[in-house]
Design a protein with these regions (language model features):
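Macromolecular interaction modules
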Residues: 1-210
Length: 210
């Protein structure tokens, strides 16, 4: 077994904007691209989401892609660098038509703390913390809940992720049963919130065998 069975500690986060007439082709290409990435060392899981509501309603990204990583070191392995050089990059139909925002993020906190192996939930709520004190406060609150909670919320995972050059992001993976709880915690934050639906969710073969 080449990968650890520990909980992933990093996320490669990609927000994507592109014209609607390219969505079907883009999705088909992405499915294959995700599977290519999942054979690389340190890549544990690939997910892609479609935007449904909220956030930047004037110009929201249509898709989010997130790779769960052992650590950010996975983005600097010889295998990853070589794959990036040899993969050929974007297909011709996307060149000049796509805009991507990339963030290489560490996981600052998670609830539950041992959320791996993951639940395959269909919904994602994402909100940005525009105040460092909010991020620290939420992180401390999550630590307290992790220590004192008798039972986890079913099909629910909350993570705070952050990179060096932008605001922290809170990822809330859930199914319909947790929607009311999420409404409460996101409304209290006063932050920018968006909702997403999962359209791709696969793990690396090593993660599935662990």
């Amino acid at each position: 077994m080449t990968e650890s069975i520990t909980t992933p500690n990093a996320v490669l986060y990609l927000a994507t904007w592109l014209p609607s007439h390219l969505h079907v082709q883009f999705s088909a290409w992405c499915d294959d691209h995700h599977r290519e990435q999942l054979v690389l060392p340190g890549f544990r899981r690939a997910r892609r989401f479609e935007w449904t509501a909220g956030g930047r309603d004037d110009d929201p990204p249509q898709y989010l892609t997130m790779y769960d990583l052992d650590s950010l070191a996975a983005l600097h392995t010889e295998a990853y660098v070589e794959h990036s050089k040899s993969s050929g990059g974007l297909p011709d139909f996307l060149r000049g038509h796509i805009r991507v925002q990339r963030r290489d993020c560490n996981v600052l906190a998670a609830l539950p703390s041992s959320w791996w192996p993951p639940a395959h939930t269909s919904l994602l709520n994402l909100f940005q913390l525009n105040d460092d004190e909010l991020a620290v406060g939420l992180q401390e609150h999550i630590s307290t809940l992790t220590e004192t909670s008798a039972a986890p919320i079913p099909d629910f995972t909350l993570r705070i992720i952050d990179s060096d050059n932008d605001e922290p992001i809170v990822l809330v993976d859930h199914d319909d049963a947790a929607t009311a709880f999420i409404d409460t915690i996101t409304a209290a934050s006063g932050s920018l919130r968006s909702s997403w639906r999962c359209v791709f969710d696969e793990q690396s073969s090593a993660s599935e065998q662990a």
